[in-house]
Structure formats: C-alpha cells, structure tokens
Amino acid sequence: MGASVLPLGLGAGDCQSSSGRRMSACLPRTALSFLLSLLLATPGARAAGYETCPMVQPGMLNVHLVAHTHDDVGWLKTVDQYYWGIHNDLQQAGVQYILDSVISALLAEPTRRFVYVEMAFFSRWWHQQTNETQEVVRRLVRQGRLEFANGGWVMNDEAATHYGAIVDQMTLGLRFLEDTFGSDGRPRVAWHIDPFGHSREQASLFAQMGFDGVFFGRIDYQDKLVRKKRREMELVWRASASLKAPAADLFTGVLPNNYGPPEGLCWDVLCADPPVVDDPRSPEYNAKKLVSYFLQLATAQGRYYRTNHTVMTMGSDFQYENANTWFKNLDKLIQLVNMQQANGSRVHVLYSTPACYLWELNKANLTWPVKEDDFFPYADGPHMFWTGYFSSRPALKRYERLSYNFLQVCNQLEAQVGPAANVGPYGHGDSSPLNQAMAVLQHHDAVSGTSKQHVADDYARQLAAGWGPCEVLLSNALAKLSGSKETFLFCRDLNISICPFSQTSERFQVLVYNPLGRKVDRMVRLPVRKGLFLIKDPGNNTVPSTVVELTSSGNPELLFPALVPALGFSVYSVTRVSDQNPQTRSQHSRPQKYSSPVLSIKNEYLRASFHPDTGLLSMIEVLDRKLTLPVNQAFFWYNASVGDKRSSQASGAYIFRPSQQWPFPVSHLARTRLVKTALVQEVHQNFTAWCSQVVRLYSGQRHLELEWTVGPIPVGDKWGKEIISRFDTPLETGGVFFTDSNGREVLERRRDYRPSWKLNQTEPVAGNYYPVNSRIYITDGKMQLTVLTDRSQGGSSMSDGSLELMVHRRLLKDDGRGVGEALQEPGSGGWVRGRHLLLLDTAREAAAEHRLLAEKELLAPQLVLAPGQGPSYHHDHHEAVPRKQFSGLRRQLPPSVRLLTLARWGPDTLLLRLEHQFALGEDSSRNLSLPVTLDLQDLFSTFTITRLQETTLAANQLRASASRLKWTTEIDPISRPAVPRLDPSSITLQPMEIRTFVASVQWEENS
C-alpha cells in the first residue's frame, strides 16, 4: 500500500524479440553484450555481503541513498495485473518492466545500487529471462549492486498473520534466493517498510531466521515524535520474554520518511518534482538550489540519529518502471553534493543499501536503547488509528486460516508417503500451488483485508486453485497408507453445513486425519438427511451418535465422537438405518426440547446458564474446580464515523473510528431454542434476522463453544456498522488485558497506555484495539477468562472485567488510504460464520488449557469422505484388508511440543520443525513450561532419518555456521550460548524455542 497517492505518469515501453519473447532487460542484444563485458571487467567482483559495501567518509555525515521499489503483491490490482502491467487505469504499475529497467540502469553505471524485496514477483520475472540475462543478474548480486532485502515471498502483514504462515512464506522466498544465488543472495536485513504496525513476534522470527536487523517506515505519530526527540529512532528490540537474549534480539531502525523520498526529490515518472537541471545556461537551472536544500535536509535529519550515518529511501510504490529517470538524477545529486566538500561541506552522499547502512551502524560500536513491547496500535494522526483492518474481510481471514490447516495436512502426507503422494492413481498431486497461494495471502494488503474487492476475490481464487492439487495429493497418499483406492471426496463447505455427498448417501466412510503430534478426540459434524445412523469405528465397534437440526439452514447434522491417533487417521463407517434397528436405538440419542424456566446446558465439567427473560448467556460454572463467574455475552455494533467536527477521518478498511464511545446492542434479547442430547447440549439464540448464535457444550469438553453467524449487515439506515461480541464479568482487572502476538507469545495490554511513551489518547475505542490472532484474556490473578478465535480479529477490554472482539464490519465510506472503495463486501463475503471458544479456569492452570486448545483449533482434523469398498491399492495383494487406522508416529509428542512443520524439502529430504509451545513460567500446574527433550530416532513410522542437519528458522543457513552482528545495549551484556552439539536421540527444546532440521530420509516400502 502506498505512503501517499501519487500523480500517475507513463511507464517505460515494452520491447520484444522477433519471436515475441521479452528480451533481457529490454536491451538490444548488442547493448546487453557490451554492458555485460563492462560488468565482467568491473573491479571488485567479490562475494556478496557486507564486504561489498561502498566506502564511506569518516568524520562526515554519510547519507545512504537507498534506491528501491515497493511492489505490493496485490492491492488496487491483482498480482497478475501488477506483474504484467494490466489495468493501468487503476494504477500505473508493471513489475516486469520495473525489473527490466532497473537491471539496464545498474549495468549502465557501476556505482549504482538497488534493493528488491518481493520474491513472488522476482521469481516469476527470473524464470522468464534468458540464460545470458540471468548470468548478468547473478554478477550484480555477487557484487552487492542488486541487493535483496527481506527475501520473503511477500512483505507480510504483522497484525492478521499467524506465525506458522509467516515462517512458511519467508521460507519459500528465502529458499528461492538460496537455490538461485547461493549465499550471495541471502538477505542480511529485514525490510518491513509498509505494514501498519509491527508485532514483537515478527521481530523474534526475523532474529531466529538470522537477520541482523529490520527497518520499517510506519510507527505511531506520537511514538515517532518522542523517538526523534530522544534520538531513539534506532534501537535493539528484545522480542521474546522466553528466549534467552540475544536469540530474539533484533536491531530495529525507523526510517525518517516512511519509505518514500524526501519532499521535492522524487524523480520517478509517477512524480511531478522537477529534475536536476545542472546546466547554468538553462533558465530552468536549479542545481545550486537543490544542493543547498539537500544539505539542509541531511543535516536536519541527521540530528535525530546517533551516528554520522543517515538513510534516505529513494523510491516508493511501483517506481523505477523507467529507472533511468531516477538514477540519472541521483547520479547528478551525488556528484553535486559531494563537490561541496571542497567548500567545507561535511556531507557525503553515496548509493547504498539497507545492509550496508546497518553495517556502518554496527561498526559505530554504540550502546543502543532496548524495546521490549511492540508497535501496536499504529496511528498516523489523532483520529486515525489503523485498527479496523484487524477485522476487515472476516470471510477471507477465515479462508486463509482454513487453508493453512489444509496445507499442513497436505505437507505432512506428502512427507510421510514420499513420491507416491505426487504421482499415483488419482493423478499428479502437488503442494506447491497452495503453498504459494498461502504465501501470497500473507501480504500486508491480502489477509489484512485492505485491497479492492476484485483483488480480494482473486486472493480467494488463488487459494481455491491451490486446494485442488493438494486434494489429489491427499488421495494418492491416503490410498497408499490405507491400502484402498477409494473415491475420496472433500467437502469444502462444511462450515456452512453443506456436503452433497453425505446429504444424499445411505452408506459412506469418514476418514478423519489428525495433523497433531498427539491423539485427538473430536466431535465429527456432517450434514445429512433426516433419519437414524449407525456409526462403526475402526475396530467395528458401534459409536454413539445423534442428529441435530439446525434452525439457520434447516439441514440436520450428524454428530459422533472420533478418536484419531497422532499424525494419522481413523476410518469410520456411516450407515443410514431404519428406526426399528435395536442397535441403532441404543446408541442413537434423540434431541430433546425443554421448557424449564432455568435455561442452562451442562456436562461433567461445565454449566452455562442463560437469563430466562433475555435468553443471553449469564453465568459459567466450572464444576470440578468450583469456579463460578457471571459472564454476560451479547452482540453490539459501533456506528462507523464518516467524519465529524474533530476530524474528517472516516472508518474504513484500514481505520476504525466509531462515531461514539459506547456501542448499540444488536438486540436486548434473543429468541432461544434448547437442544439436549447425550453428546451435545446447545442453546440456539436468534438476535435479529442477520445475527444469531449457537452456544454449544459437547460431552467431555472443558470449554464453551459460541458459533456466531453475522450478516449481511443492514445499512439501509445509511449507517456503517462494526459488529462486536462482548463478554462482561465482575472481574477486577485494573484496565489490563492480554493478547497473543501472531498466535505465539502473549503481551500485556493496558487501557489508554503505551509502555514506550506517555499516550495522549484521542480515540478511546479505536486507540485501545489490538490484533488478536488466537486468544485474548482477562484475569484478576485468581480466575482467568480466555476467548480463543478461529481467525484474526481486533479486540480490547473497554472496561474492567470486559472483553470484546470485532467479528464483522460493513462501511459506507472509504477511509482515504488509497483503496478508493468502501468496505461493502457484496455477495457471500457479507455473510460470515465463526466460532469463539470460551475458557474459564484458575489463573494458574489456564495456560495449559488455552495453549493446547489453540493448537487443536489451528490444526483441526481433516475429514475425507468415500463410498467405501474401493479396490486394493496393492496390485499383488488383492486379499489385503484395508487399514482403518494409522499413526505416522511410533510414540506421541509431549503436550508442550508442537510439530510445526513436516514437509518435503527435496527428492529424499524433509523439512522438520519442532517447537516448545509454552512460554517461560507460563504453566506451573503441569510443568509444561519446563525444557523438554525428544528422541527423533525411530520416531516416524513411514520413514527412517538417515542424516539430520540443523538450520536457522527459515532453513536457508546451517545453524552451526550462522552468525549475526553483535550489538551493545543499555541492559547488561548478554552471554551468547554456544550451538549445542546435534544428537538426534536428544533434541532439547527450551520454552518458546523452535528448532528446524533438514532430514535425509528413506521411506519404508510398505508404509
């Protein structure tokens, strides 16, 4: 997304060979050959890295000019429209031409340097180049003249993203660079110049990936003023409260001008600033004036930073389509400014890169301030809090989270089965399309919900296209593992209770795959026809079941409990039978309706009570722990501002700005229906025609499930609405609440407060909203109320004892941040269903519950249906009995360990990540916060690990040889622990530690 809306201009023209194929760097072949010869003759063709950085001038103010383009992987145009340069009526932007033009300009002058970031675009461009051009680019990279920063597939959002998906997309991009350029192309610096606020977990992940620092453009306007005054625009971010420093320490720099050029110095074809006119005979001569202005600008900017180095970003959104206009003027500026040194100037200007600038800061050997909180929420003005996008486009946010779940299942089965998953009886299975689509969705205008509508539709299209090849892969893998070639069917619409196969079949099988490293109990819910059903487990034992009718759709749903082994599957058979079957009658529970004045649902652990007059949730009791807490839950809506006397700022895709502090109730009461069976008890609440909820309690469950359905939000009254679910309790919380950071570590939040500066709160609601990726909770030190989410949402505690989460929003006015559309979400995006999981526990025992429950929700079991009675997979074993149950692990993982990644890496290698999912000191009831040691030998059942190499988090460097720059901080010096010797039989994980391995494997013949 752009820092500002710039005037449109004309881009560079295209050029093609006689065959119609694009020629290298848009240059005639003779010119390319000539420039290539110059490149080969250029001195200093050394390995890339800090040693290729340009010389600076000691004793002078060195101004590092960073030529760059910021290429959104979708925003106003789709990814393909941006790459090819289509629909320039929406935005002048063609990434293929930018890269062509930049390479040409770099070849023309050896001092020039350029930075590129988005591998989603660069990899596509790279594969379209000739061998000759590729060799030219490799040499530019080796010389440090073309530098990659960040290196992920995209520049991911930091508020609406889950850490697992962040790691995956960074791994995808960095692997492309490693495979293409080796260590020469390895980024040293993270470059998050456009995301709208910055999470602590993101910094921790960057540090664990081996980055030496991060630079970004956006921080809160109040924070920035304070930092400039204190000269704390650069600092060391201590990004984990669990990992021993400096493992998660990351040098952090705030750029002086967001990420655009200084005012008056934008020389792109999209800009209107005058070029450098250095001919004194011209009436347009301005060189002397520009030099004077630049010297004043550099000196003023330098006052806010601690060293004799400062940085200026020379570029912005989709700039450098005609790179010559930029570089020609920068060449002149550098020459003219440096000539003033003969007249006593102490300013030295040079082409540089983020890594080279960081290198000079490190060599300054200063003591740097330390930050331990995060950079949320972000505001660029008193009434301009970028907290709306935490909740924008909730349907897309859920689709992204479901796709992450499905991708992990796909990756795991591909890893467990090996090549037979890719080529088998169902065709060619491939995890790459979904992996790439998921990477694209992490972009800061994708999962954030801040693109135009047609772009959001295209993001969903990419995900849907990625599911298909994974479904083929799953079919191949499951056929091999089960020994039966079934007609596997995948119901993608189970979230809205639609599955034509289960709704029309009299007899079928349900294969339940569990991606967790531990066995799981799960209640299976499938839409069916009315009737009774006989369920058999893998051992042919009858399983209890019930059919519940949904009031929202009228479709009955079949429920039965499934027990599934770790990293494996169980196959259940379902048969529709007559009411006369005695076996069915004994195992089938009929729903019962109750007219008791006390409206409540209960199991062996919990009782939830509802107010008899309003139908709203009013009380939760934890029976075995004797905890009771009044909890009032209802839906409310904020009236979205369209601007007022204080500010013209409206609520929009990015900005949350309610017109008043207190929301309106959606309804003061709910019409209710009570359903009780042996397996589940439910209260169906209907608030309005567009807002309903089912409060559900399964047998054996320690949490309450609230399944809400909202939309389409009515706006006939011309009021935009932002819908929240709010939980009110009498807990005395002192303005404090807690939210997760990208689904991982938890941060304390305090109402109307920032740890880093004294806040002037100008928006009492929006200024207290924070991103919630997986959980939010309040506690009085004795009891803790936790709400888990099924997607990223905005959340807060607007009064003591209260929690709220924004579930949906529909707005009638654009917020002026460049999208140019109101967030209306026509069609299916306007109707959204989701779930909140409510946990009440003692503060001491709460972490053990919410950590493990969040893992189960993120990596939920995958249901695959089949008619049954398929032919044998093995041609030479016609009599073989199909396998009804399977586990990919010979022993379960401990509760504190999560299998973060199990995926194919190469023809005979796998990528394996194991993480400790508890924070330091978080759990004392079950000792789940202690270090844990694993034996990887003989752990997996379908393959044997023959060699194990440990890498950094993104798997692009061996851990033993990876090193990062060292920084001195204002906090006591830190000892740097040595890398432990790798012993596959003894892998120890410290709290919140992730360890990454590339494993050479040999698959078993009959896995």
From Swiss-Prot:
It is linked to Defects in MAN2B1 are the cause of lysosomal alpha-mannosidosis (AM). AM is a lysosomal storage disease characterized by accumulation of unbranched oligosaccharide chains. It catalyses: Hydrolysis of terminal, non-reducing alpha-D-mannose residues in alpha-D-mannosides. Binds 1 zinc ion per subunit. It comes from the Eukaryota. It holds the Pfam family Glyco_hydro38C2. Residues 1-47 form the signal peptide. This is Lysosomal alpha-mannosidase. GO terms for cellular component: lysosome. Its EC number is 3.2.1.24. It is found in: Lysosome. Belongs to the glycosyl hydrolase 38 family. It comes from Cavia porcellus (Guinea pig). GO terms for biological process: mannose metabolic process. Zn(2+) binds at H70, D72, D194, H444. The keyword Ligase does not apply. Its cofactor is Zn(2+). Necessary for the catabolism of N-linked carbohydrates released during glycoprotein turnover. SMART domains: Alpha-mann_mid.
